Amino acid sequence: MEVEQVLNGLMWKHANEPEFLQAVKEVLISIQDVYNQHPEFEKAKIIERLTEPERVIMFRVPWTDDDGDVHVNTGYRVQFNSAIGPYKGGLRFHPSVNLSIMKFLGFEQTFKNALTTLPMGGAKGGSDFSIRGRSDAEVMRFCQSFMQELYHYIGPDEDVPAGDIGVGGREIGFLFGQYKKLTQQFQGVLTGKGMEYGGSILRPEATGFGALYFVNQMLQTRDIDIKGKTVVVSGFGNVAWGAVKKATLLGAKVITISGPDGYIYDPEGISGEKNEYMLELRASGEDICAPYADEFKGSKFIPGRKPWEQKADIYLTCATQNELNGDDADLILSHKPLCIAEVSNMGCTAEAVEKFVNARQLFAPGKAVNAGGVATSGLEMTQNSMRLHWSSDEVDEKLHYIMHSIHGQCTKYGTQKDGYIDYVKGANVAGFMKVANAMMAQGIV
């Protein structure tokens, strides 16, 4: 069956799952040429199997608030593919969470993990619970109830969740504590843990650090030095924090961060104590970035707008999926940028991606450029299994090597006849080939 026929069937079958279909369509269009060169893939129905999760777990999560009132949320764990290793992927606590988003993230995670060179399958999970405005005690009770069901399906050699939006160090601690109590085992069943109980150094910064290593590699393909370049960043969570920190260390100047309320423009650059203040804003639970302008003179808060209107050399999406649309892409292209990177998962709409690629713009897709987070999670798994702890320099060196390797895979499969590197195609084909070959070797399962 041709790729187009498979895609049409999926669009009919999953018509109510737009995010999942968007992710699947991007991958299938990218890999159709290489897929057609392998008739054995079609015979084994690789695409049909690859686009269907191995397991979808949905469950209720009852919990009580501080007033004693009962609430019920929905929990998810989509175990998408385990062909190259145990399931691996984050947990997201946010009101927007639904099955379509969990499936899209699990599908993307499968290819992202394949690119890291580490033995990790793809999964994603979470709940439509919001931590905003909730006390520590309420968050703890929710996490304990969530783990009460999830623990049946995870383990260090089965499925190893991590954090994501709404799930930081506090939540991972509560989840791990409940898992330990239920199983009476101290295992590396979660990553993103605190340093005191099996966590890896640099894990909070890893996604942002890895993204800048990848962006730097992209710029070097055109003999461009990142030093002195201006950077527009969206978001103000861990991903943005890590990206700002590493961009500054590499000699670039970050001039924006953003939140649901608008964005901050700081022409003097966001670094040092300004960058650390971002974490205070995020920890406040208010989900707004406006207070930054009150804290630091010379900066300006622009309410209700996106940071893409600012002219810069490099643009990084670090907030959430589909935050950058076609109109935003036109605006960015009018600034004549050097590079755009999708540091958030599927941070750009399909229309935006198409515009960047058609313009022959240096564009990094999320599954490649933001793989540093899960790569460092994989390094945490390794440290837990070996019962040892690596230094900051050791972890950073391994992360740098992994991102360099991912960039190499993208250029191998994405370089076009005219010399343009289509990183979207390169990442998709590289990830697909590894997973497909593993599935072929393991039979029809």
Question: What does each of the following model-derived ranges do?
Answer:
Residues H94, N113-K227:
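Glycine/serine-rich phosphate-binding loop and adjoining beta1-alpha1 elements at the start
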Residues E40-D69:
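Structured beta-strand/loop patches that form or line metal/cofactor-binding pockets in enzymes
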Residues T191-G194, G199-K311:
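Glycine-rich phosphate/diphosphate-binding loop of Rossmann-like nucleotide-binding domains
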Residues M1, A15, E19-Q22, E26, ...:
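Conserved active-site and cofactor/substrate-binding residues in soluble primary-metabolism enzymes
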Residues L21, Q37-I46, T117, I154-G163, ...:
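Flexible, glycine/charged-enriched surface loops at secondary-structure junctions
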Residues G262-F363, A368:
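Rossmann-like adenosine-cofactor binding region
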Residues E2-A23, M218, L333-V445:
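Adenosine-phosphate binding glycine-rich loop
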